[in-house]
Amino acid sequence: MSSFVSKGITRRNVLKTSATAALFGAVNSAFPAGVFAETSGPETPKATLGFIALTDSAPLIVAREKGFFAKYGMTDVAVQKQASWGATRDNIELGSAGGGIDGAHILTPMPYLISTGKVTKGNVPVPMYILSRLNVNGQCISVAAAYKGMGVTTNATALKDAFAKAKAEGKEVKCAVTFPGGTHDLWMRYWLAANGIDPNKDVSTIVVPPPQMVANMKVNTMEAFCVGEPWNAQLVRQGIGFTAFTTGELWADHPEKAFAMRADWVDANPKAAKAMLMAVQEAAQWCDKMENKEEMCAIIGGRDYFKVPVEDILGRSKGEIDYGDGRSVTDSPFIMKYWANHASYPYPSHDLWFLTENIRWGYQPADLDLKATIAKVNREDLWRDAAKTLGVTDLPAGTSRGVETFFDGKTFDPENPAAYLASLAIKAA
């Protein structure tokens, strides 16, 4: 056990460390380096960002608590907890000028759903930019304890039979996700459909905010849910259910959350946006280092953020997974990554997959101009510019990661999304 753990991972200890970092960050911001060395600095030092209590929000929280925002001149960045993804959307629509937020830790498909007006009030488009990916991997599909012992993993054959039996007996079978068309919804739908379970006909897909998943499973509200950490680990620790699989087992190193902002804010404050992007990139590098995991978990687990025991976050953040059904691993290859292997780079080819799946399930129209839509929302060019200014030399060679392979053998070729869509047996009518 490390000395950090033996002394107690307390919010007070972490705040002392963070306060020191913030102090040095503030000093550094008085003499900003790199991009701001010969300029007047960011147009504004202020921005308001939102986050949901999920481990993959860590880069935004750490950027604030460890002084990375301040280091690049963004000395007044608020990182505010949102009650749900719906609340995140509502506050992005408002913008900080209207009492909302300028940007957020967000499910990657949401900036597209918001920019196209599919989920906004009156279907009015609110243009957004994806500035960075926040992580790959790290989500799970967990199942109620009643189904333990059936061998449910990515293979859900037994679950298909159990669900069919329950439905025949008049029971409503519910699977919970966090936002329609979001990543958790798409992982759940992909898994069910790959196992012959139609998510639109054979089960009821319900929306539950991430922090409420465990409480709802406890009172038998649903059979399964898809969400990020720490809620799957908490479910297992409380003995309420088990993790069927981590989403990296569904698609290795899959893209997950994004750091996105209102386009009008970025357009009005390009230097401030770059400063924040650099801070988030530096925070992602910090979060990815194993020696920082304990402090990272202590920071995000504190009462200003998640309000959960560090133990609910730490294990899986280090690749230690107790699935809750007898399986366990201590060095999972599907650990959440924030920076390694270009995890932070927002590959447009990945956004193309999300849009294709949103078309599959009816969240986006079949005639959507995919190339034009991605060009408007995905600002990988800004990511590259910020990374180069930071001195990053290992940049992605292109804007596509190439052909992606899923657990069921299906492949997605970004050069031919129509062929992928045609290969899928179950989809919205």
Where are these regions (language model features)?
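Short, glycine-/small- and polar/acidic-enriched structural segments
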Residues: 38-200, 204-207, 219, 223-233, ...
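Conserved C-terminal helix/tail region of periplasmic/extracytoplasmic solute-binding proteins
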Residues: 352-429
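Short glycine- and hydrophobic/aromatic-rich loop-to-beta-strand nucleating segment
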Residues: 141-142, 258-261, 265-266
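Ligand-binding pocket segment of bilobal, Venus flytrap-like solute-binding proteins
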Residues: 102-103, 201-243, 262, 294, ...
